[in-house]
Amino acid sequence: MKDVVVVVTGLAAMEPLTARRMMVGRTAAETTTTGTWTTVHILASMAARRASMTMTTHLRSRVRRIPTRPPRAPRLSVGGGGGTGTAPPARQASPETATIGTRTIGPSKGRRRRRRRMRRRRRRPVTSSC
């Protein structure tokens, strides 16, 4: 009988020990018995689970440390960056709109509100649970 080679993919490959054990998944009699096969399978699945768990926790611990990217410049202000019109700073609205005197150039109030709400929703970190 030919040698049985088991290909280890994905997370099981992270644990080289079980991978090796899977490669040598045949007995001395050149045959793969169901017993060794199942044990190998169980070991592999356990290894995969452990690896995935450690990975997710690792990533979860990393999430807080990612620096936030600098805010994009609003697409509508008249002057330079956020909220610079020719108005005095006290009269200026949010950085998303450019205020000149009392006249505001930019999206309407409702639109702005909706945008803010969307932005708030987007901030939650997404972590897959295994």
Swiss-Prot record:
GO BP field: negative regulation of ribosomal large subunit export from nucleus
Origin superkingdom: Eukaryota
Keywords: Nucleus
Basic residues: bias regions: 109-130
Region (Disordered): 61-130
Gene Ontology CC terms, in alphabetical order: nucleolus
Principal place of residence: nucleus
Compartments where found: Nucleus, Nucleolus
Functional description taken from the UniProt entry: Acts as a late-stage inhibitor of pre-60S ribosome assembly by preventing pre-60S ribosome export from nucleus.
Extra remark: MINAS-60 is the product of an alternative open reading frame (alt-ORF) of transcripts coding for the RBM10 (AC P98175) protein. MINAS-60 and RBM10 ORFs are overlapping and are formed by shifting the reading frame.
Assembly mode: Interacts with 60S ribosome assembly factors GTPBP4 and MRTO4.
Name under which the protein is recorded: Ribosome biogenesis inhibitor MINAS-60
